[in-house]
């Protein structure tokens, strides 16, 4: 989400996933490596075999999705950023602590909202799931997850499993009960997700509307 990439400020290699921001929500799988030519060659040799490098390799029939995703990524990411800023301002006005706040400079698409209770975190995530294009009928529940000391709740009715550019939210059930909201393939969908999260909070008596 910034004008400069890590390679602009000294990084020799940049690696990442295409089911995140750069894939624009269209890449179903894949990753990328960018950087110094000699290091890219070494990476390619490691991936396939010395001497062959990136001259060979399966494309799996998804190159069109890769290129279209890269083309649309700036627009998709802009919508996700707009959704995060909307979430920050809306929940700030309701009295919740948000990180970053509605006016701070942003370095990614993630928006944290501290919901102050397990009930609040669960209601928020239920609202995000209810706004999903896939599995909107599913009710997310906290569960024990490897690597966490506390139960974690996740909402992600996405077309691509694990995509973080699609609408999602998650958080561990411990103080300050923060939900980490991100994504939305369009600004309108991100906005709908936040409104649905507020609806669930309202239904649980956690926020009031004057």
Where are these regions (language model features)?
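PLP-dependent enzyme catalytic core of the Aspartate aminotransferase-like
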Residues: 150-210
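A short linear-motif detector with a strong N-terminal bias
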Residues: 10-13, 89-92, 157-160
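Short, basic, helix/turn surface patches
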Residues: 21-27, 42-49, 126-133, 163-173
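Conserved small-domain helix->loop->beta segment predominantly found in fold-type I
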Residues: 61-75, 88-152
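Structural motif
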Residues: 12-14, 31, 110, 135-137, ...
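A general structural signal for short secondary-structure boundary/capping elements
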Residues: 42-43, 61-64, 77-81, 125, ...
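Conserved PLP-enzyme active-site core in the AAT-like
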Residues: 1-78, 82, 95-99, 187-210
């Amino acid at each position: 989400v910034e004008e400069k990439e890590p390679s602009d400020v000294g990084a020799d290699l940049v690696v990442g996933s295409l089911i995140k921001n750069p894939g624009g929500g269209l890449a179903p799988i894949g990753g990328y490596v960018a950087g110094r030519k000699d290091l890219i060659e070494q990476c390619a040799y490691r991936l396939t075999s010395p001497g062959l490098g990136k001259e060979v390799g399966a494309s799996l029939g998804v190159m069109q999705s890769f290129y279209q995703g890269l083309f649309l990524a700036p627009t998709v990411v802009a919508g996700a950023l707009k959704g995060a800023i909307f979430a920050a301002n809306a929940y700030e006005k309701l009295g919740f602590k948000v990180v970053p706040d509605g006016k701070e400079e942003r370095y990614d698409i993630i928006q944290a909202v501290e919901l102050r209770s397990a009930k609040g975190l669960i209601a928020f995530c239920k609202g995000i799931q209810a706004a999903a294009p896939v599995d909107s009928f599913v009710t997310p529940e906290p569960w024990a997850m490897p690597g966490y000391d506390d139960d974690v709740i996740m909402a992600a009715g996405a077309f691509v499993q694990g995509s973080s550019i699609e609408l999602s939210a998650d958080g561990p059930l411990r103080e300050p009960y923060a939900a980490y909201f991100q994504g939305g393939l369009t600004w309108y969908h991100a906005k709908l997700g936040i409104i649905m999260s507020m609806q669930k909070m309202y239904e649980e008596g956690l926020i009031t509307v004057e």
